[in-house]
Amino acid sequence: MTPSWPPTPADVARLLEALALAEERSPHYRARFAAAGFRVTELRDYDAVRARVPRTAKADLVAAQRAHPPFGDFLAAFPSELAAVHVSPGPLYIPRLADEPGGTPVLREAIGAMGVRRGEVAHVTLSYHVMPGGLRLHRAFEEYGCVVLNGGTGASALQLQVARDLGATVYAGTPSFLGRLADQARELGWDPRRDLHYRLGFSTAEALPQVLRAELEGAFGLELFDHCGEALIGPVAGECRLHAGMHLHARDLFCEFLDLATGEPVEPGGTGELVATHLGRRALPLVRYAPGDVYRLRVGDCGCGNPAPRVDFVGQVGTIRKVRGVLVHAAQVARVVAEFPELGRFQVVIEHPAGERYERATLRAGLVREAPTDLVGRLARRLKETVLLDLGVALVAEAEIPEDAGPPRYAGAMVDRRTH
């Protein structure tokens, strides 16, 4: 989705430019387009692109890089031209040219939309180890004009000491690590609001349910801004000061939101799967890449004046199941689970036992601390209020829940044991 929808001729021209570059420089896309029976010069409008250009899945990149290591046949540049390589789970290798921004221009815009001032100290706590997130944010804050504290993950007591000494006023990282910093501060005998100086927070990589947002904002006295992205795509969307949905970053991406059943573009108010094409990326361009993320498009314009469409992250294809006629989203369940500090990872197990009339869904919630006696009842009530379905609840040790069932993607959170 671009700032206008349907896309304007200028939007489509940029999209066709990106497709032509991929066809010319990437052996994978050149062969794939030929196999689909078209040349990019034959495409005239968005409808033709949607009808003829196949989607790219993460599995395509994994297979290509295994068959032709290290970068597969997607690479659209000579290896000697590369300036950096990042890694995404898979593992997948993400190369970048020296003059490719890697998402930093849109991140700088997002930082400005939060009200960050040049010269402020920004504390970046995403991982700098192999993954691209920490370095991307670091570069964006630095280029914006901030003093950057490269905290990374772990060593929370040391990070608190340094953040206090430097007077860090901007936090950037996951909401769960910010919560860990609050707990650590209290263990040190500090009051997070009094002894630390955070006033703004760039929350990313995990869901930010309203209950958790309120808890963290209350603990630190800061204002949190929700942002989303994907390692291969880069930044996708972020909140403005009105907190009325996340604005799409349309500078570097042509984003489509397609109905899960029909593949047709959804209208504002609808829910669809993200399909993204890089505009201008030359090392490893992705064409109609579908990471499996599902978004709801908001209706109307934002009062902040930014014309870019607004979205809310719903969940992932594969993390949404229909149970007794109700769509159950792993991300929706995650927001409820996040309200209970006793709980960590979870799974929703869906069954239709032989001889029983109705399907059954049970939440297996992993305990990370001792549970009060009324936890099961309170959790079941909140689930029904939010999911609009009665879910059974079973408390288990968190070690019994696989790691891929946790944030940020909840890939293993939905276990469907029905035989259809």
State where each predicted segment sits:
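Nucleotide 5′-phosphate-binding alpha/beta core
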Residues: M1-A113, R117, G355-R364, E370-D404, ...
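Structured loop/turn residues at beta-strand edges in well-structured enzyme cores
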Residues: A13, L166, L196, L222, ...
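Active-site phosphate/ATP/adenylate-binding loop shared across adenylate-forming ligases
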Residues: A48-A219, F225, I233, A237, ...
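Generic structural signal for residues in well-ordered beta-strands
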Residues: V148, L224, C255, F346-V348, ...
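Conserved beta-strand termini and adjacent loop/short-helix elements that scaffold enzyme active sites
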Residues: G151, H227-G229, L258, E351, ...
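AMP-binding/adenylate-forming catalytic core of the ANL superfamily
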Residues: Y171, V275, G280-L389
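Conserved AMP-binding/adenylate-forming
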Residues: R199, L208, L212-D301
